[in-house]
């Protein structure tokens, strides 16, 4: 979650009017704000980064202190392109620097592969992989001490058919297994959108110490395209080993995204819907309703 150090309230969103502290967790700070970045590709990454730039500037103005968002929030989570932004913020990158990442390398990353390969995916993973290694550091691990705050990345384990949540909480159930996973690889796994990029292979140790290779695809291919609810659960549900207190005076969840699909249909228009229209509507409705039901395909990592 994004948790702010600030006191006072500005338009009810940027600051939490609280001095409460967590009773456990990885990074300690006063106040609680949760920040989830849902997935959008080229335009979404840039647009969400612009929202982050505005937030960063506003907080710097209010506090009179120049600080990256990674130092102002206790947890930052992201799915797909949101995972790139979340990881960058946790490493202390400025919102402007992350926006420039998309502007500088978008064309390179989204260069289409030769025709025979397009049957499987539009783009090669090599440019994106190279830039993620360059931006986050090839040797940076999920447990790296350079991460300024708690990180949550959503990915879909295609081999198991389960949604995996990668985090850097040392008290988390699967932290011992995941601590040495390269950060760039975790982020790349969350951005592996089917038909756009090939899956990301990752070798992950199991409970017996045996290493198992899995294939991961975009975390948006799950009910956690917008990870806000999972970020809230990670922070507050005791089984996730944070156990932060809830309440309007103790925690603030900020969810930044650049798209919304309304489920309402204008009067008289439903009768005009064709098969494709109803397919899209059904998928949107399923994502909306399932996020509030008990997850059956998830594995906290």
Tell what function each PLM region has:
Residues 35-39, 71-80, 150-156, 215-218, ...:
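Extended hydrophobic secondary-structure segments that form protein cores and membrane-embedded regions
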Residues 43-44, 86, 223-224, 260-263:
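Flexible loop/turn segments at secondary-structure boundaries
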Residues 95-127, 168-172, 178, 225, ...:
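Non-catalytic peripheral regions of patatin-like phospholipases
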């Amino acid at each position: 979650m994004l948790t702010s150090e600030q006191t006072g309230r500005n338009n009810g969103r940027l600051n939490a009017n609280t001095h409460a502290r967590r009773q456990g967790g990885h990074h300690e700070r006063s106040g609680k704000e949760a920040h989830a970045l849902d997935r959008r590709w080229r335009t979404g990454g840039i647009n969400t980064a612009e929202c982050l730039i505005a937030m960063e500037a506003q907080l710097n103005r209010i506090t009179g202190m120049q600080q990256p968002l990674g130092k102002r929030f206790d947890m930052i989570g992201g799915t797909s392109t949101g995972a790139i932004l979340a990881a960058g913020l946790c490493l202390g990158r400025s919102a402007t620097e992350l926006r420039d990442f998309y502007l500088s390398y978008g064309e390179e990353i989204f260069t289409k592969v030769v025709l025979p390969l397009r049957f499987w995916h539009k783009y090669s993973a090599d440019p994106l992989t190279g830039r993620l290694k360059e931006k986050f550091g090839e040797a940076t691990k999920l447990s790296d001490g350079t991460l300024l705050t708690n990180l949550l990345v959503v990915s879909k384990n295609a081999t198991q058919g389960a949604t995996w949540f990668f985090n850097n909480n040392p008290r988390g159930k699967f932290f011992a297994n995941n601590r040495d996973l390269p950060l760039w690889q975790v982020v790349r796994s969350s951005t592996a959108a089917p038909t756009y990029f090939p899956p990301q292979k990752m070798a992950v140790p199991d409970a017996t110490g045996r290493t198992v290779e899995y294939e991961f695809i975009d975390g948006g291919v799950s009910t956690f395209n917008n990870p806000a609810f999972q970020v809230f659960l990670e922070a507050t549900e005791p089984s996730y080993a944070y156990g932060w207190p809830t309440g309007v005076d103790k925690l603030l969840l900020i969810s930044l995204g650049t798209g919304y699909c309304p489920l309402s249909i204008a009067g008289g228009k439903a009768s005009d819907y064709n098969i494709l229209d109803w397919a899209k509507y059904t998928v949107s409705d399923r994502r909306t309703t399932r996020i509030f039901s008990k997850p059956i395909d998830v594995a906290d990592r």
